[in-house]
UniProtKB/Swiss-Prot annotation:
SUPFAM superfamilies: Ribosomal proteins S24e, L23 and L15e. It comes from the Eukaryota. Residues 193-204 have a biased composition (Polar residues). Residues 171-192 have a biased composition (Basic residues). The keyword DNA-binding does not apply. The keyword Ribosomal protein applies. One of its GO terms (molecular function) is mRNA binding. GO terms for cellular component: cytosol; cytosolic large ribosomal subunit; cytosolic ribosome; plant-type vacuole. Keywords: Ribonucleoprotein, Ribosomal protein. This is Large ribosomal subunit protein eL15z. GO terms for biological process: translation. Residues 161-204 are annotated as: Disordered.
């Protein structure tokens, strides 16, 4: 077995004594640092490589901290308008995952980079931690690599904000195929709009 196989086996057994101790110590360290931190190398090299990371120029990894819990509706002093059924503030369920929020925050902070992918790293009672893989689309090492230079195309600017990363597509319900999923494509809103628009074809 190669070294990456051993590393991935370690990460699969997260309840082992070694991993529980490591994760607890690391979590303490992460709590002391800012919410978005650049790393020298990925903490999970096997996972990062599976998701597109390469240890070469132009590739960077950032750790992002996201607060756990539900999303409160951002209304000043809790003043909401409309019918009582739509006046909820606290027990609303956010439609995207914490991982996609982490990708979004990294993408906003680092506007010149492109988000490739991300993965779970750690969590405690208050926060979840993710590592985000980003590339520099202006770097020649990226532009000349046929495996990644697709991301230099301007249509891939801020793909994390438009639900185009792996996690974004998952949150949009685009992982499945077949007749059970045809209402999710091209998007749930587009399908709703098509089904709720009265279209009177002109008689010719």
């Amino acid at each position: 077995m190669g070294a990456y196989k051993y590393v991935s086996e370690l990460w699969r057994k997260k309840q082992s004594d070694v991993m529980r101790f490591l994760q607890r110590v690391r979590c303490w360290e992460y709590r002391q640092q800012p919410s978005i931190v650049r790393l020298v190398r990925p903490t999970r090299p096997d996972k990062a490589r599976r998701l597109g990371y390469k240890a070469k120029q132009g590739f960077v990894v950032y750790r992002v901290r996201v607060r756990r819990g539900g999303r409160k509706r951002p209304v000043p002093k809790g003043i909401v308008y409309g019918k009582p059924t739509n006046q909820g503030v606290t027990q609303l369920k956010f439609q995207r995952s914490k991982r996609s929020v982490a990708e979004e925050r990294a993408g906003r902070k680092l506007g010149g980079l492109r988000v490739v992918n991300s993965y779970w790293l750690n969590e405690d009672s208050t926060y979840k931690y993710y590592e985000i893989i980003l590339v520099d689309p202006a770097h020649n090492a990226v532009r000349n690599d046929p495996r990644i230079n697709w991301i230099c195309n301007p249509v891939h600017k801020h793909r994390e904000l438009r639900g185009l990363t792996s996690e974004g597509k998952k949150n949009r319900g685009l992982r499945g195929k077949g007749h059970n999923n045809h209402k999710n494509r091209p998007s749930r809103r587009a399908t709703w709009k098509k089904n709720n628009s009265l279209s009177l074809r002109r008689y010719r």
